[in-house]
Amino acid sequence: MRSLRLLFPALLFVIPSAAAAQGATAAPDERAAVLAVVQRLWDAMKARDTAMARSVFDSSAMLSRAVTRNGEARVQLTPVSAFLEALSHATEPWNERMFSPEVRIDGSLATVWTEYDFHLGDKFSHCGVDAFQLLKTSAGWKIVALSDTARREGCQKQR
């Protein structure tokens, strides 16, 4: 009985941490499904295919960019509709590539954090970090938010 009293408090610490670790670890097939959505967006951008691009976003999705102007950090919000409109007028393919993506999944919520570089056609434009939030819906994984940074310096993987 005494050993049970000692074991119970220990289990209170072990069980929640094991469950948390398991929840954040993505099963290989779910990880692949989440990354496929991101890649589908980039394939759509390269092809300038607005229908394909629209298909990866949830209807409530929003895009945001962290920018610094006059030494002050701000968030620049862009509706998906404005992004799609710009894509429809692109004269060159938008070529974005990811490097070393980190995927976290807990139930129906997934996050992808990845470095990227961006080219207009074959010409380097900028690099940064993309942070995707995805929701698993009845239609599959959908992007509900995409935040990024963009810079021209310190881009080690731009070729």
Which residues does each predicted region cover?
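Bacterial N-terminal signal peptides that target proteins for export
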Residues: 1-8
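Short beta-strand edge/turn micro-motifs at domain boundaries
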Residues: 111, 126-154
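N-terminal signal peptide c-region/cleavage motif recognized by signal peptidases
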Residues: 14-18
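Hydrophobic pocket/interface hotspot
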Residues: 41, 53, 61, 112, ...
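A mature extracytoplasmic/lumenal domain signature
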Residues: 57-59, 67, 114-118, 147-148
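Surface-exposed, charged secondary-structure patches
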Residues: 22, 62, 74-124
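Short, low-complexity N-terminal intrinsically disordered segments enriched in polar/charged residues
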Residues: 19-56, 77-78, 158-159
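Short, solvent-exposed secondary-structure junction/capping segments
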Residues: 39-43, 57-70
